[in-house]
């Protein structure tokens, strides 16, 4: 093995150890790649939502993330749970846990916020609501991994109607500026 390859491996391993021990329970770029790859290997199609979904649409990581939000089709839900529990994730019951929205955490503090949906004649059924089919038409990248995600317009709509935080403000303003979308009224005070 050449010297530069050995140096790269040593650097990568040191960086990986550093991020594992000093990340305050964040889901890093490397974590996202690992999660996406393990689900892809199980032939599970996922759609990114939330902060990582925004960053995928933008094409780069724009902030830190405490979780990864994934939408999976109902037919793939059991295999998805089997894959992630096989990697050490356990369900964490939250106030908002439903049959279609669960949270999973591993011993390293990585959190997967799992959303289960199904395709219906009128669109996409999630948590008792029907959304337009194009909701999942977003395309983006996490590094060199092409991903499907919630489209920019739906991402902005999903950030309405609740008490938002600074990450929500960051995400909405970034989406609106990047994709030339109108900034929602409740976010205009942050311009």
Q: How should these model regions be labeled?
A:
Residues 8, 14-191:
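Compositionally biased terminal segments of proteins
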């Amino acid at each position: 093995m050449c010297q530069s390859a050995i140096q790269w491996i040593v650097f990568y391993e040191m960086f990986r150890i550093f991020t594992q021990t000093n990340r305050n329970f964040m889901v890093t770029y490397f974590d996202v790649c690992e999660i996406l790859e393990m689900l892809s290997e199980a032939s599970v199609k996922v759609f990114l939502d939330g902060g990582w979904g925004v960053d995928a649409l933008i094409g780069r990581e724009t902030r830190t993330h405490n979780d990864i939000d994934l939408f999976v089709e109902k037919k793939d839900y059991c295999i998805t749970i089997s894959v992630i529990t096989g990697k050490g994730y356990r369900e964490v019951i939250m106030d908002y846990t439903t049959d279609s929205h669960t949270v999973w955490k591993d011993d390293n503090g990585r959190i997967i916020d799992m959303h289960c949906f199904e395709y219906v004649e009128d669109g996409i059924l999630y948590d008792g609501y029907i959304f337009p089919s194009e909701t999942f038409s977003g395309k983006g990248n996490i590094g060199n991994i092409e991903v499907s995600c919630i489209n920019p317009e739906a991402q902005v709509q999903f950030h309405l109607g609740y008490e938002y935080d600074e990450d929500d403000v960051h995400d909405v303003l970034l989406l609106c500026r990047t994709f030339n979308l109108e900034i929602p009224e409740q976010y205009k005070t942050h311009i």
